[in-house]
């Protein structure tokens, strides 16, 4: 899956840390494996700082790590749970059933 993100303001964010409002580019890859906290600690121990962490009311969440100097982009580590799996099942369903009419689909 490719996720396209557009930030419609200049507020500070993990995306604005890398690109200003007139710039665009490849921001991050997302990884969904193992225990989130353990994986973040492993990356931190390797010298990659946690930049942003969040968790939604539904229990979805992630941590962005600063891996730009090493690999050219940030790395996102997901919290893997039923809510995340359901979200991506909905994304897949929307893609498979897309009628070609709307470029933006609200899920």
List where the protein language model places each region:
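Glyoxalase I/VOC metalloenzyme domain signal
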Residues: 1-49, 59, 66-107
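A short beta-turn/loop motif at secondary-structure boundaries
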Residues: 55-57
């Amino acid at each position: 899956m490719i996720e396209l993100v557009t930030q419609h303001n200049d507020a500070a964010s993990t995306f604005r840390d890398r690109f200003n409002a007139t710039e665009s580019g490849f921001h991050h890859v997302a990884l969904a494996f193992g225990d989130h906290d353990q994986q973040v600690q492993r990356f931190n121990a390797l010298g990659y700082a946690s930049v942003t962490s969040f968790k939604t009311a539904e229990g979805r969440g992630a941590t962005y790590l600063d891996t730009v100097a090493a690999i050219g982009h940030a790395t996102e580590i997901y919290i893997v749970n039923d809510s995340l799996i359901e979200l991506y099942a909905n994304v897949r369903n929307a893609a498979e059933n897309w009628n070609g009419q709307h470029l933006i689909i609200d899920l």
